[in-house]
Amino acid sequence: NICRSPMAEFVMKDLVAKAGLSDKFEIASAATSTEEIGNPVYPPARRKLAEHGISCEDKTARQMTRRDYETYDYLIAMDHNNLRNMARFVGGDPEHKVSLLMDHTRRPGDVADPWYTGDFEATWQDVLEGCTALLEELR
């Protein structure tokens, strides 16, 4: 929860604010693994957001919990591995709340993981496209 998911969290918050819909959404991100719990957003991800005028100050990684499934209407995964981990946390998806971000676009699949690729621009493009499409669906 230090690269893609916080990028998606803060991009979505930015899009929602620009649409004048902030009072209609509660947006957060959480980790599906434990490695980075408590750590801030990875500096290159933070810089990529800042390039677009988006701050993620004070964000630290937190662990996803079963309560997240009860609290949120939608749980959006960045890749298939996240989907599997999320299903484990929430005990399946009986309410059909879980989906991949890119499945809301014309290019379904995984969001590029910059932790491995080093390509934060490709991740930015995926996240922006996915969040824009998701917001359009939810309007």
Residue ranges and their predicted role:
Residues 74, 80-139:
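Phosphate-binding/catalytic loops
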Residues 1-71, 136-139:
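Conserved active-site segments centered on acidic
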